[in-house]
């Protein structure tokens, strides 16, 4: 009898909503939501501490299920995808020496010139982002990281891992993006890479929506203003603004 009473006294109450939410989540435990795995997110949503559409992997379908569990209206979620802001392939980017050391992006501060490539802003191709991606959505192709748009779940792990901040999350529906992150002046850029942005501002002047600006010699697109007309892509003399 004592054990029965003690069992009731110390029993852990189970939040049925939390259990249902956890079952609805994909279970990747990628941490892209900002919580320690799916269990942490389920608990936060059940307590009202996180929005029902917080899971980037589950996206809108999972968000709708969780909204139903919480008795809320479903919130429309725009899908995102990771994008690498670099075009410096082995063919296009100048290499100053042959690197034979450890291939780890976190070692860049200790590597001469920050890597073999003349451009110190671009992708070194060591692939730390590849190793951290839980969905196999990133691959090193011709010396730079390339994202498989369909496989990417926008968990953001690659964004956090890249020491040069070359990877960003952009709308899945986005039609064009700037594939460069260099802030060097034009002469330095042309000496280091065949396709780097030289900050000429032709894209900025051509955009009919004011979505493109050039800051510190590099073009940037405001995705909220961009309509995907492609005018900037056509105007770019370096071919650094590309379809995504």
Go through each PLM region and give its residues:
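Ferredoxin-type iron-sulfur electron-transfer modules and their immediate structural context
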Residues: 1-206, 210, 233-235, 239-243
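Glycan-recognition and catalytic cores of secretory/periplasmic carbohydrate-active enzymes
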Residues: 219
């Amino acid at each position: 009898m004592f054990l029965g009473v003690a069992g009731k006294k110390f029993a852990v109450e189970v939040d049925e909503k939390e259990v249902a939410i956890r079952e609805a989540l994909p279970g990747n435990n990628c941490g892209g939501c900002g919580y320690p795995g799916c269990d942490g997110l389920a608990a936060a949503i059940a307590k009202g501490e996180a929005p029902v559409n917080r899971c980037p992997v589950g996206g809108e379908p999972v968000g709708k299920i969780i909204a139903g569990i919480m008795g809320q209206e479903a919130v429309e979620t725009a899908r995102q995808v990771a994008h690498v802001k670099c075009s410096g392939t082995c063919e296009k980017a100048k290499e100053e020496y042959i690197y034979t050391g450890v291939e780890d992006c976190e070692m860049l501060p200790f590597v001469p010139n920050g890597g073999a490539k003349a451009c110190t802003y671009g992708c070194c191709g060591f692939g730390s982002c590849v190793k951290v991606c839980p969905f196999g959505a990133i691959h090193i192709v011709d010396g730079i990281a390339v994202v498989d748009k369909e496989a990417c779940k926008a968990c953001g792990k690659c964004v956090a891992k890249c020491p040069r901040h070359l990877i960003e999350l952009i709308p899945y529906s986005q039609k064009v993006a700037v594939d460069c992150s260099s802030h060097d002046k034009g002469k330095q850029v042309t000496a280091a890479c065949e396709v780097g942005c030289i900050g000429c501002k032709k894209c900025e002047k051509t955009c009919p929506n004011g979505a493109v600006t050039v800051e510190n010699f590099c073009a940037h697109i405001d995705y909220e203003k961009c309509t995907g007309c492609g005018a900037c892509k056509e105007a770019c003399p370096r071919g650094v603004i590309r379809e995504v």
